[in-house]
Amino acid sequence: MTTLSFHHVTVLMDEAVQGLNIRPGGIYVDCTLGGAGHSSLIASKLTEGGRLIAIDQDDWALDNARERLASYMDRVTLVKSNFRHIKDIVKDLGLSGVDGVLFDLGVSSPQLDEGERGFSYNADAPLDMRMDQQAPLSAYDIINEWDEEEIAKIIWLYGEEKFSRRIARQIVQQRKKQPIQTTGELVELIKEGIPAAARRTGPHPAKRTFQAIRIAVNDELDAFKEAVVDAIEVLNPEGRVSVITFHSLEDRICKQIYQDFSKGCTCPPAFPICTCGNKAVVKVITRKPILPSEEELEANKRARSAKLRVAEKL
């Protein structure tokens, strides 16, 4: 993919950046640079005294950002890394804290649409799915080396696919004959594992399984949990974290972390004084998630599952 072909429609862009309550001289972190939509908007709101740190582990995204953010590079620092390292990144840059952190957990459209990366079930390509091309674990490794129980487990947990065991069985039976090399081969095996009646309704039959394998390859959920907790830790008082999720697993994690960090005293009401010592760390700004507008949904069908949650450091 060339830099110019990296075209990605950013979801909930205005709402997520508004949620950060940008101050022109503040320090902000975009943990998911992607197509640089959010980063471009944040950078445009900063003065020369402000700073944006934009993180991505995908070389394509970073190359694209160097062009898209060229006029703002006096206030932008690009970092190739996984966002789970946000605390170390902030520390290594000599910063004591930041004023806002943004996460957009959607996979960039170019990654989905370009078959060569192995993310898409609509194109035949080598099984890969690595966001970081230097990472050791690929989709090929999972599909051809993990045991049947492990494969079924991740498809169930990360894809919420009720036919996970049948799909895992098809995969293991086929790889006994020869290795499964491509996404096209995997799609056919997934279809064979799902009853015909179930294949005729709902989304593409491979959607949930591909999501599950991608999450496992990139350790997305554990990385996200670590990153949100650490993002809250590095926030300055009144700093905000904006999180856009695209499926229920991510949204539940975000909601639970916000709830846990917003809890104050947990002593029984009858206690005359607090003995637990618990203090709220954040206040939740969005009691209910912000959803895309009808106009955005009409323009971008991939926005339909997006949810935005915002919290503020106390």
From Swiss-Prot:
Reactions catalysed according to its record: cytidine(1402) in 16S rRNA + S-adenosyl-L-methionine = N(4)-methylcytidine(1402) in 16S rRNA + S-adenosyl-L-homocysteine + H(+)
Taxon lineage: Bacteria, Bacillati, Bacillota, Bacilli, Bacillales
PANTHER family assigned: 12S RRNA N4-METHYLCYTIDINE METHYLTRANSFERASE, S-ADENOSYL-METHYLTRANSFERASE MRAW
Spans traversing the lipid bilayer: none
Protein name according to UniProt: Ribosomal RNA small subunit methyltransferase H
Pfam family, one: Methyltransf_5
Enzyme class: transferase
Role noted for this protein: Specifically methylates the N4 position of cytidine in position 1402 (C1402) of 16S rRNA.
UniProt keywords, alphabetically: Cytoplasm, Methyltransferase, rRNA processing, S-adenosyl-L-methionine, Transferase
Positions of disulphide bridges: none
GO molecular function terms listed in the Swiss-Prot or TrEMBL record: rRNA (cytosine-N4-)-methyltransferase activity
Amino-acid positions noted as binding S-adenosyl-L-methionine in the UniProt annotation, renumbered to this chain: A36, G37, H38, D56, F83, D104, Q111
Localization, UniProt: Cytoplasm
GO BP terms in the entry: rRNA base methylation
GO cellular component terms, A-Z: cytoplasm
Family membership noted in the UniProt record: Belongs to the methyltransferase superfamily. RsmH family.
Principal subcellular localisation of the protein: cytoplasm
EC identifiers of the protein: 2.1.1.199
